[in-house]
From Swiss-Prot:
Keywords: Disulfide bond, Electron transport, Redox-active center, Transport. Disulfide bonds join C29-C32. Induction: Activated by SigB in response to ethanol stress. It comes from Bacillus subtilis (strain 168). This is Thioredoxin-like protein YdbP. Pfam families: Thioredoxin (PF00085). InterPro entries: Thioredoxin, Thioredoxin-like_sf, Thioredoxin_domain.
Amino acid sequence: MKKITTNEQFNELIQSDKEIIVKFYADWCPDCTRMNMFIGDILEEYNQNDWYELNKDELPDLAEKYQVMGIPSLLIFKNGEKTAHLHSANAKTPEEVTEFLSEHIS
């Protein structure tokens, strides 16, 4: 998973005509650490997509713009638009994440 470190990088990446997945996280977040323990297998399953992570504390304006209230959250973007958002309350298990991706990735 590649790291997004600037607003410019983020804005360029989301313009892709294929779906990209962005994980919003924070270093202090226990649920983010828990997700990191299982996300590797999901990355392998959905390896046709580009995956990125973005530290909400480093780029808070992006988290606010895309209504990321809790972390971890997974957002899917295509052609500059957010097409899906898995809120932190529903991102606690591999099954929840896989179900979300199977519903929203074409």
